[in-house]
A protein has these predicted regions:
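N-terminal domain-start signal
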Residues: 1-252
């Protein structure tokens, strides 16, 4: 874990502070926001995003950078931890999967996303069946039918969240010191279940506390990934606001 810890500490030190976020979010033009991001630790996230990209292109680019981030972090980890690390790439897919499970219409960018396009292109009934089968493949009894009960067309958002967390836990290698990892799992579950109940500042505070206690432990990688997800979400908001205004989706 020495190599992984040194890389994680370096990346953690590059994370934007409040002043940089304020500078990025204060600019009205996305081109300027991209310049601010490229001059900071956010530069990896905005690679490939042009000043004239529309909102859907921005979403696809950020999601691609996210998967690259998780893959890179996984490569730093001991082999036994790589399956669990790679599984976290699905963290940012959960809101989209829950949206589809509620019966929401696929958003335009979903048709271009490597993971979500199969769901987006399916008709509603097939989409629901696909969601249930894919969740059931790794959740086992959580999605099993009891007796002759008729299963709903799609799993509930809470079932998707639970199945994702169960599979993540299943991928943890045998390891005696799982206390901090369990604390992180509970924190992620609470944040995914009720995002408004745990505000961003409180979530960041708790993650920082866990990170300080995780030196040379595998959990440090997962805590950093959680930070990366928060940073991507905030960057997306900063970049999409002018793009959506330009596209006529929100008022400028």
């Amino acid at each position: 874990m020495d190599y992984a810890q040194s890389r994680l500490q370096a990346r953690f030190g590059e994370r934007p502070d409040d002043m940089l976020w304020q500078a990025l979010e204060a600019v009205p033009e996305r081109g300027v926001a991209l310049e601010v991001a490229r001059a900071s630790g956010l530069r990896r996230w905005v690679a490939g995003i042009s000043a004239d990209a529309d909102s859907h292109e921005i979403e696809i680019a950020l999601r691609a950078r996210w998967r690259e981030c998780v893959t890179e972090i996984s490569s730093w980890m001991p082999a036994g931890w790589q399956p669990a690390t790679l599984w976290t790439s699905g963290l940012v897919d959960l809101p989209a999967l829950c949206h589809l499970a509620r019966g929401g219409r696929p958003l335009p960018w979903m048709f271009s996303d490597p993971l979500l396009q199969a769901y987006a292109r399916a008709d509603p009934m097939t989409r629901g069946r696909m969601l249930r089968e894919d969740c059931g493949a790794f959740a086992g009894s959580s999605f099993a039918a009891s007796g002759n009960a008729v299963l709903p067309a799609a799993p509930s958002p809470s079932s998707i969240r639970k199945a994702w967390l169960e599979e993540w836990r299943r991928r943890w290698p045998r390891w005696g010191d799982t206390g901090l990892l369990e604390n992180l799992a509970l924190l992620l579950d609470a944040a995914l279940k009720q995002p408004a109940a745990i505000g961003r500042p409180e979530l960041v505070r708790r993650l920082r506390s866990l990170f300080r206690r995780s030196v040379l432990r595998p959990v440090a990688a997962f805590i950093y990934i959680a930070f990366a997800a928060l940073d991507m979400e905030r960057l997306r908001t900063g970049l999409l606001k002018p793009a959506l205004a330009r596209d006529g989706i929100i008022a400028s």
